[in-house]
């Protein structure tokens, strides 16, 4: 999954660099520009907090305090690698692509808020599933659906406020999925590699998980 989303992200970045904003970018921008609403606009602007890197970092650190030391270490390491790596790749892509935002001269592709939101949602789902909290399909479905709505809301917020093009948001989603699933796969490989060592320690009369 990580490779598929990474390839899709690179292709979209190529299009953004070569063609600039696509026709659909202009159409979606015009739609939001003609659909401004005072109350809705206020809500959407506030919704962008779910993609704010600093707020998410503080929230994740606070959440980790409820975990055991071992889980806390893995949890914080995951998000350090995923958010840090995603942010770095995103900034490098902005410089390589060089496409401006709709309303100002800042680099726009991909949307950093969307990257952060997507990585956070994917990471929380990963740890929820691994811990068994989301072992039931209903719990998984509700959590994944809620996460998707949060990410979608962040993306809409960035377009509604004329901060990003539609393809900026799509790029952020694809990069977020690629990075988070890639880090999760690396974590799983590390666990699988350590398992034979644990089994070897269980041999020779050691007690492991029972008599």
Regions found by a protein language model. Give the residues of each.
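Hydrophobic alpha-helical transmembrane segments
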Residues: 48-68, 128
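Alpha-helical transmembrane segments of multi-pass membrane proteins, especially transporters
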Residues: 30, 78-83, 169-173
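Alpha-helical transmembrane segments of multipass membrane proteins
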Residues: 4-9, 86-90, 154, 176-184
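Small-polar-interrupted transmembrane alpha-helices in polytopic inner-membrane proteins
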Residues: 77-97, 141-156
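Interfacial segments of alpha-helical transmembrane regions
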Residues: 1-3, 60-85
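Short juxtamembrane and helix-loop transition motifs at transmembrane-helix boundaries
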Residues: 36-47, 69-71, 102-105, 130-137
């Amino acid at each position: 999954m990580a490779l598929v989303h990474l390839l899709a992200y690179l292709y979209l970045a190529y299009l953004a660099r070569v063609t600039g904003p696509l026709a659909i970018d202009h159409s979606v921008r015009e739609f939001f520009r003609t659909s401004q609403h005072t109350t809705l606009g206020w809500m959407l602007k506030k919704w962008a907090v779910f993609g704010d890197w600093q707020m998410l970092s503080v929230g994740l650190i606070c959440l980790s305090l409820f975990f055991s030391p071992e889980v806390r270490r893995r949890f914080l390491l995951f998000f350090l690698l995923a958010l840090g790596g995603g942010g770095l790749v995103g900034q490098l892509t902005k410089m390589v692509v060089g496409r401006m935002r709709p309303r100002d001269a800042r680099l726009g592709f991909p949307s950093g808020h969307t990257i952060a939101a997507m990585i956070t949602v994917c990471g929380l789902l990963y740890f929820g599933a691994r811990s068994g909290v989301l072992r039931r399909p209903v719990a998984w479905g509700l959590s994944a659906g809620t996460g998707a709505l949060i990410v979608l809301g962040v993306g809409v917020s960035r377009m509604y406020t004329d901060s990003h093009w539609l393809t900026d948001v799509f790029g952020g989603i694809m990069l977020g999925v690629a990075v988070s699933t890639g880090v999760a796969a690396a974590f799983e490989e590390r666990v699988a590699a350590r398992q034979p060592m644990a089994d070897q320690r269980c041999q020779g009369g050691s007690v492991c998980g029972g008599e």
